[in-house]
């Protein structure tokens, strides 16, 4: 019992360290350095901005949207989402491994997707949340208690479909299987993911792949278990489900083979859902891009063909730098594959990528046509 008490006390201190005085903050950072390898602590203003977003993100979001998110960006994004939905339906119709019965169920689910773009239609009001200039720690306690009460108040009530799981400034996107919705906060609708004035190759290769990725989550190893209404229910024929699992096993083996650090490999099972999302998403985005005027042309821009610009735009999204310690931690805990493997994992299975860059037998990333995997 005494050991359990000590453990619980330690957890409280560890969870609260960032809200306490400097010695606690420094001790917490020193502990995290061992896991992440981070040499210098994130500047205080960035840490406070992140915490503010986490506590009152929709208040902060209103300011962010007013300053940085233009109406034309939302309109352009809605157009992209609609075009990718059309492309996805075409791809479902053309699948050679799925029966007509399961195809229809898949299309029903696709048609039922609810897209959310930029910011909520109804802003959270934070009524009853007490924030003062007297105590940072108490503010965070109050915020935690308020959030808990808000969640409990939703019990036994109809689902509020106006709520968002991310704040507007968030640079991310998500798919919710129980809501069957795809959500794109304003924060991700900027370079390198999106630019309203950019050519189609750039936008379809970047944010288009993200849109397709989130759509594909509705049909990955987890999302595929939910129907169009968000109910956990099997809608596959026995034969189609077996074929789907066989294909995902091949994708898992592909990522298992990637060596990240010494003997540490990517975990193909842990990252399965995200890898299915990447493979499906890039294919759907490319299908949609080829329906545009630029996608059907051969005109070069800055010396690159439309198809090359599409794939280069996808690649640029995954530029980054990560310390070995953080990379090792990611491999063991994160369902996302490291960026350097996400950037090659999907294209090596696409005939269009080989044609765009004239990839031939003997080249490092070459895969035989019969070994290139197509799921969605």
Q: Model features per residue range: what roles?
A:
Residues 78-208, 217-376:
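Zinc-dependent metallohydrolase catalytic domains
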